[in-house]
């Protein structure tokens, strides 16, 4: 909003889920998807979504109750594992347990419900999602110390903004807004001190400042 309109308030936020995020992008309800959406070959090449610079590398993991006394997801034989049925998370979890020949009971959570809520109700022994989400959710639990994030990282999740194919000007704006934020952070420039760099003697910073 600041880059396009010069106004940080000129923005509207839409709440999306694992299914509606893509339909909203296709039908123009949203101009850019900034949810935790993994950059994959299928989404990019076959489904024609343009993934712009990765802003965060996450990895999928698991959380379980400390009282179970386990220290690894590989110890969860016969456990009930809940996960969202949409997105890459379900496939990653299935692949992990198949690879390690671990029998488990899948509890597939619908789009109208959250895995963490099903887990907290005691309907599953463990749930899996991106580790940043696990850490954030755990902080919101009534007794976070009673839950443990297991050490396994079962995937690599490159996350960043997504736009529709076909609008080169818009994708260029989003792409270079992200790059400018990267470069500015590397040089120690932020919204509070940017004016002090206007007459900087470094030619590289001079070019960056325009």
Predicted regions and their residues:
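Sec-exported extracytoplasmic/periplasmic mature domains
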Residues: 2-6, 26-30, 67, 81, ...
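Acidic, polar ligand-binding/catalytic clefts
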Residues: 6-75, 131-155
């Amino acid at each position: 909003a600041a880059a396009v309109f010069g106004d940080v308030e000129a923005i509207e936020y839409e709440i999306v889920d694992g299914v509606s995020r893509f339909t909203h992008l296709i039908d123009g309800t949203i101009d850019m998807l900034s949810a935790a959406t993994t950059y994959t070959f299928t989404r990019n090449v076959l489904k024609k979504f343009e993934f712009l610079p990765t802003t965060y590398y996450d990895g999928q993991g698991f959380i379980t109750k400390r009282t179970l006394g386990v220290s690894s997801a590989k110890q969860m034989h016969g456990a009930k594992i809940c996960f969202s049925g949409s997105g890459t998370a379900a496939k990653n979890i299935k692949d992990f347990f198949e690879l390690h020949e671990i029998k488990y009971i899948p509890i597939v959570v619908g789009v109208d419900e959250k895995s963490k809520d099903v887990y907290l109700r005691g309907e599953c022994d463990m749930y899996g999602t991106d580790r940043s989400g696990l850490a954030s959710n755990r902080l919101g639990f009534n007794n976070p110390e009673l839950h443990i994030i297991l050490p396994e990282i079962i995937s690599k999740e490159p996350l960043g903004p997504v736009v529709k194919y076909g609008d080169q000007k818009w994708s260029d704006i989003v792409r270079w807004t992200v790059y400018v934020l990267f470069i500015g952070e590397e040089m120690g420039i932020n919204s509070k001190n940017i004016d002090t760099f206007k007459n900087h003697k470094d030619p590289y910073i001079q070019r960056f400042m325009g």
